[in-house]
Structures are given as structure tokens and as C-alpha cells.
């Protein structure tokens, strides 16, 4: 390979790197439960994102009945009361706050959420195990 061709390939690669659109990766992590059985649900889902606007402006909701059906999960009254809100947890970290206004009486709550925003469209399932409150 001659020198001219080598330089040309390097220039094309470098220009390609600078002209590519930046990909902002968004992924969902584990869920942390802060409430007990027979209390209103209070949980946080860890969010990994390189773009604050992507998660803070995302549309977060319970996935459709069809998605739950395909996963073999039933949507109950507790699911319909769930609220999802993107929050900042400090030091540039983000989470999705999952809450209900009314107490959850089921010890296991399985659900699928859908997050759409920017270039991301994520669907992920979670299983929440609620322990009785400590006496």
C-alpha cells in the first residue's frame, strides 16, 4: 500500500469520527425498594445515562397490556396506580421514582416499564418483593 493511500484512509476515518452523531446511551439498572408491604410503594430504578436531558425529558410509563400479556404478566389495580417520575439523585446521577398513593397489599409486584426519549426506546421488567414492616 502506498503512502498516499494510507494517509487518505486515516483522514477518512478521522473525519468520520468527528461527523458521526453522538450516541447517548440510556440504560436501566436495578430497583431499590424503600417501602414495605401494606405501605404506598416507594422505589427507585437506577438510570445510566450520559445525557441528563434524555432521561429528565423521557416519557416513562407502565408498558401496554399487550407487552405484559406476552411476558405472561397480569396488570392489577396496583399497576394502574403506579406513577413514574425521572429524578436527579445527586452528583450527576439519575433514577426513576416509582410510587403509588395507596398501599400495596401484594407481596410480589411484577411489572414492565417503557421509557422513550431522545434516541432511546427501552422496555424492562422488574419484580418487586415487599416485606412486612419491621415491628
Predicted features and spans:
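Extracytoplasmic/periplasmic low-complexity
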Residues: 1-135
Amino acid at each position: 500500500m502506498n503512502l498516499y493511500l494510507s494517509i487518505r484512509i486515516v483522514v477518512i476515518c478521522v473525519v468520520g469520527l468527528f461527523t458521526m452523531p453522538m450516541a447517548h446511551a440510556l440504560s436501566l439498572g436495578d430497583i431499590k425498594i424503600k417501602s414495605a408491604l401494606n405501605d404506598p410503594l416507594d422505589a427507585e430504578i437506577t438510570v445510566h445515562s450520559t445525557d441528563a436531558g434524555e432521561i429528565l425529558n423521557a416519557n416513562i410509563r407502565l408498558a401496554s397490556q399487550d407487552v405484559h400479556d406476552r411476558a405472561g404478566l397480569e396488570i392489577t389495580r396496583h399497576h394502574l396506580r403506579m406513577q413514574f417520575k425521572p429524578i436527579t439523585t445527586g452528583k450527576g446521577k439519575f433514577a426513576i421514582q416509582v410510587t403509588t398513593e395507596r398501599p400495596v397489599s401484594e407481596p410480589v409486584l411484577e411489572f414492565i416499564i417503557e421509557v422513550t426519549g431522545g434516541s432511546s426506546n427501552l422496555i424492562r421488567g422488574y419484580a418487586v418483593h415487599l416485606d412486612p414492616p419491621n415491628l
